């Protein structure tokens, strides 16, 4: 169901960024067109050169291209996308998204996106368990975003608990199932009522609800 879909893959500054390369390859193999948007800290974990080579597109990180002054429109990106996936999503980026802190290209694009947004949190055990993180994730969920819950296991800190970014194969499955469900509803006609309805049987009888 991903063939021909336009996917924004947002990458933030966490050790799980290496999994984003695997996810990128899976998306392309499934036939999707992928545009990478990476935060400045994300580039400390994985190079734009690698991502550009795999995606076949220039990686976007800043609002302007330094050597040409070319403007990258977050509005155009938001309109282009069929879905936006942020994997990994660090506590910092989650907080910015939840509270509208548009200080980088990724969060600005998120705030402009018209497409469904899928967020895969990844962080250490204590950060994941912190009340502020839980609040921000719940806020994002209340906005209509899809939260791909992190898995439990050994973390980069060698602690064991919840905080591992979900595996790329599972994220791909979530996206595939979303588009499959959307396709099954395409073209359907739905009647929405506000109040009781009546279906006439004969001149004196009807079936109704209230």
Regions found by a protein language model. Give the residues of each.
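A cross-family phosphate/adenosyl-ligand binding-site feature
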Residues: 1-210
């Amino acid at each position: 169901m991903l063939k021909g879909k336009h996917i924004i893959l947002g990458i933030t500054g966490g050790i799980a960024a290496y999994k984003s390369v695997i996810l990128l390859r899976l998306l392309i193999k499934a036939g999707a067109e992928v545009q990478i948007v990476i935060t400045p800290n994300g580039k400390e974990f994985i190079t734009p050169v690698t991502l550009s080579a795999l995606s076949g597109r220039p990686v976007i990180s800043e609002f302007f291209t330094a050597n040409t002054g070319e403007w990258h429109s977050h509005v155009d990106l938001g309109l282009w996308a069929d879905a936006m996936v942020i994997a990994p999503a660090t506590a910092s980026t989650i907080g910015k998204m939840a509270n509208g802190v548009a200080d980088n290209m990724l969060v600005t694009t998120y705030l402009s996106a018209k497409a469904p947004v899928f967020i895969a949190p990844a962080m250490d055990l204590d950060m994941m368990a912190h009340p502020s993180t839980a609040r921000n994730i719940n806020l994002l969920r209340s906005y209509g975003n899809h939260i791909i819950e992190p898995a439990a296991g050994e973390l980069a800190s060698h602690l064991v608990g919840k905080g591992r970014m979900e595996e790329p194969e599972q994220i791909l499955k979530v996206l595939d199932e979303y588009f499959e469900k959307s396709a099954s509803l395409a073209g359907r006609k739905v009647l929405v009522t506000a109040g009781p309805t009546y279906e006439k049987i004969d001149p004196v009888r009807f079936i109704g609800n209230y």
